[in-house]
């Protein structure tokens, strides 16, 4: 018999793999419960500046060779719009994405009912 314990070794390997998967699953469940919490919705017209955004705003050189802070564009825009912004990291210098609400079109009345 060349390999008398192949099924026992396979069972042991499978058990170790299942244990590893179970521990990773428990870690993900533990981490997921804290990261999946959605923030409270903001009222339209209120700026949404998070701590992560203000810390994550980087200073990027502009085309003229000077330094332009994205925050200088973010503050006036966020205070005058009906939407809100999602902070992001971008290679193109876009530090936030605007999210505008979808408004339903105003129904237009057709020809008046004549009897």
Curated annotation (Swiss-Prot):
GO terms for biological process: DNA repair. It comes from the Eukaryota. InterPro entries: SOSSC (IPR031821). It holds the Pfam family SOSSC. One of its GO terms (cellular component) is SOSS complex. PANTHER family: SOSS COMPLEX SUBUNIT C (PTHR31526:SF2). Belongs to the SOSS-C family. This is SOSS complex subunit C homolog. It comes from Drosophila grimshawi (Hawaiian fruit fly).
